[in-house]
Design a protein with these regions (language model features):
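N-terminal secretory signal peptides
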Residues: 1-11, 15-20
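C-terminal segment of N-terminal export signals and the immediately downstream linker at the start
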Residues: 26-44
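Extracytoplasmic "Venus flytrap"
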Residues: 40-63, 85-91, 114-115, 188-199, ...
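Extracellular/periplasmic periplasmic-binding protein-like sensory domains
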Residues: 140, 260-336, 348, 407-426
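Short, charged, surface-exposed loops that flank catalytic or proteolytic processing sites
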Residues: 347-360
């Protein structure tokens, strides 16, 4: 965090598309000065969900550098202020900072990322106040349905791009089918937005897994930051669970997995959402981190480029590592894409002084980004468009302690695999 971005780094802006994108963004001499445009950005930068915000400073710093003196919209150059706020991994705090950005700072556009505990309260504030907003890094069902979204109506000013539960279910089943097990799945679903959506008996994992021939053992919801999972572990052992899945926050998975090892519970597969997205979360498990599997939304191997800079996913991730001395993380690409989408909408809006015009521009988005194509012309419900999802497994790395290998790409064959799912060690 806090590292500087240098857009003149050798090789980062080589792509011709990047040069064209920058020429369209950077002001020319003949452009008149426009009023400042304010963009609010909210994410969890501290607290148990801080891993999602680890790359924020790098991404935001890069966007600021790319914009230079401003964003050219028709014949005017508008200085752009990016107001970054920390949700502190708390829904109430997220709503509070969003309200201040809207009512006190008078932002023109809101960007928000990472888990329902941040995206939902911020999106709700924007919807109530008619503020254009784009969100991501949250499955679409917890974002849309938990906010009271109606498939035949949708929302007025809030839009979202990410994958859905149907995608992660498909990815997990595809990975599990490649390993011989008894098809008994133990579920760790917390009592939060993600856990309740994943465990929903009508729209979540249970009916889909049953249809695929898997038996689900659900010991019930548990509160985040639980320090004793003995009850769940005992249930899984009694029911002969060989696959564990769930969507715990990172510290809870660390607690569960270490206690499971201590108590002799050794499943063949552990496919966990949210908690295993980040290298440092896997490193916290020590040797027990080898073989963990998870959903993968973005990697340096993804075949996409930034519409702002022309940088490929590989170049972007490499620049992050050079600048921060840290391993890439999945939110890196999506946070950048949020700004790609937001700036593109502002450039196309009929008037930046008309919030309705900005909303209309968001709705009309048709943009190839660092995470793939974004267009709300098609989606499972109004205000939602989906991005590709694959499955990956953590293993010993060459230059890093653990590295990600894509092991399932059935739903996105344009993203290459690097191996097959390995069963976890049983001793």
């Amino acid at each position: 965090m806090g590292q500087r971005w240098r857009v003149d780094r050798r090789g980062f802006l080589r792509a011709g598309a990047g040069a064209a994108a920058l020429a369209a963004t950077w002001p020319g001499r003949a452009s008149a000065q426009g009023r400042p445009i304010k963009i609010g950005y909210v994410s969890p930068q501290t607290g148990p969900l801080a891993g999602f915000g680890e790359a924020d400073t790098f991404v935001v710093g890069g966007v600021r550098k790319t914009l230079g003196k401003g964003l050219k919209i028709r014949d005017r150059v508008h200085p752009v202020e990016i107001l970054v706020r920390d949700s502190q991994s708390d829904p109430n705090r997220a709503a509070e900072v969003a309200s201040r950005l809207i009512l006190s700072d008078k932002i023109d556009l809101m960007l928000v990322a990472s888990t329902p505990e941040t995206t939902n309260p911020v999106s709700d504030q924007c919807e109530v106040n008619g503020t254009p907003a784009v969100s991501s890094v949250c499955p679409w069902q917890p974002w849309f349905l938990a906010r009271g979204g109606k498939p035949d109506v949708g929302f007025k000013s809030t839009y979202h791009f990410f994958w859905g539960l149907e995608d992660i279910i498909g990815v997990f089943i595809d990975m599990w089918n490649s390993v011989e097990t008894n098809k008994v799945v133990g579920a760790l679903w917390p009592n939060d937005g993600d856990g309740n959506a994943w465990g929903d008996k009508e729209r979540g994992f249970p009916p889909a897994l049953a249809k695929a021939g898997y038996k689900v053992i659900d010991p019930g919801r548990y509160p985040n930051l639980t320090d004793d999972f003995s009850s769940q572990i005992a249930t899984f052992k009694r029911e002969k669970v060989e696959i564990v899945t769930g969507v715990p926050i990172p510290p809870d998975w660390t607690t569960f997995w270490k206690q499971a090892a201590q108590q002799g519970f050794r499943p063949k597969v552990a496919s966990i959402g949210k908690a295993l997205l980040f290298p440092r979360s896997v490193e916290a498990l020590g040797d027990l981190g080898d073989g963990m599997s998870t959903e993968v939304w973005w990697t340096p191997q993804h075949p996409f480029k930034s519409s702002l800079t022309g940088a490929s996913a590989a170049a972007f991730a490499a620049e992050y590592t050079r600048e921060t001395k840290k391993q890439w993380t999945q939110p890196l690409g999506f946070i950048h894409a949020l700004f790609e989408v937001g700036l593109d909408a502002l450039k196309r809006a009929a008037s930046v002084d008309d919030k309705g015009a900005i909303v209309a521009a968001i709705k009309a988005t048709n943009l190839n980004t660092l995470v793939g194509p974004i267009s709300w012309a098609k989606g499972p419900v109004p205000n939602v468009t989906k991005t590709p999802l694959v499955g990956g497994q953590w293993g010993r790395g060459k230059d890093v302690r653990f590295d990600m290998t894509i092991v399932s790409n059935r739903s996105a064959p344009n993203i290459p695999t690097g191996g097959k799912l390995r069963p976890l060690k049983q001793a």
